[in-house]
Amino acid sequence: MDEQSQGMQGPPVPQFQPQKALRPDMGYNTLANFRIEKKIGRGQFSEVYRAACLLDGVPVALKKVQIFDLMDAKARADCIKEIDLLKQLNHPNVIKYYASFIEDNELNIVLELADAGDLSRMIKHFKKQKRLIPERTVWKYFVQLCSALEHMHSRRVMHRDIKPANVFITATGVVKLGDLGLGRFFSSKTTAAHSLVGTPYYMSPERIHENGYNFKSDIWSLGCLLYEMAALQSPFYGDKMNLYSLCKKIEQCDYPPLPSDHYSEELRQLVNMCINPDPEKRPDVTYVYDVAKRMHACTASS
């Protein structure tokens, strides 16, 4: 069918709609057992659909990744190994990875559906209303985020892409850390083309210098996120900024202080400890989580 006649008959049904017989023996490991409902997101290398499992009715997010176009064989193997690690994570504040399989020449990842807003939407909402987020609310969400990251780090898994858009908040106020950074598996020629997609406000100095990512790089991002919840913008945000000046600001840890009349010394100090140019001097996630628990307890009761 040519494009024109296709257009006259309305949008084409995605070819991965299940036309196959159900495969109860395969569980979540085949497209035949899912009904695709609608596209809910797209990334640089993937598209995400809301879907329902036809076996048990569970709503899921189905992420389809162009694994063969964008990766070499080693990266594919590493990516699949990493997803197997993610499937072992089991925590109320981490988006659950149910299954992954290759079908129709794509990597399909079946995830818990985070059918709610995310932290970036909440920050925008407060900004629009010209109001700061109350400190007790900051700790209420941040403590859950720390709990999620502590679980991941204790299983030797790094997140690699902590930012407000990847922190989902359910209707009942439960934080779900999602979209774990698999981007590093894509070929360098692909990522080079995308290096300016989404300004890297959360990139640590060691990543700028390509010194590799480690657990302390997640802590840098955690500090940037705590700062953004308080200031309603990234510590390194600037209106008329190019990548070079952003990298300079990050290297020098050049960011405006948080207002001391609105936020506690503890919050401001924790931000400063996490946003430290030397990864060795940043605290580990257990320390950050302990501070968050203490502050959540004392602000929730006040």
Swiss-Prot record:
Source organism (scientific name): Homo sapiens
GO molecular function: ATP binding; metal ion binding; molecular function activator activity; protein serine kinase activity; protein serine/threonine kinase activity
Domain Protein kinase, chain residue ranges per copy: 34-299
Consequence of substituting residue 172 to A: Does not affect interaction with NEK9
Tissue expression profile of the protein: Highly expressed in lung, muscle, testis, brain, heart, liver, leukocyte and spleen. Lower expression in ovary, prostate and kidney. No expression seen in small intestine.
Consequence of substituting residue 33 to D: Significant decrease in catalytic activity
Resulting phenotype, residue 169 to F: Does not affect interaction with NEK9
Name listed for the protein in its UniProt record: Serine/threonine-protein kinase Nek7
Effect of residue 132 to D: Abolished interaction with NEK9 and subsequent activation of NEK7 kinase activity
Function comment: Protein kinase which plays an important role in mitotic cell cycle progression. Required for microtubule nucleation activity of the centrosome, robust mitotic spindle formation and cytokinesis. Phosphorylates EML4 at 'Ser-146', promoting its dissociation from microtubules during mitosis which is required for efficient chromosome congression. Phosphorylates RPS6KB1. Acts as an essential activator of the NLRP3 inflammasome assembly independently of its kinase activity.
Stated consequence of mutating residue 262 to A: Does not affect interaction with NEK9
Cofactor names: Mg(2+)
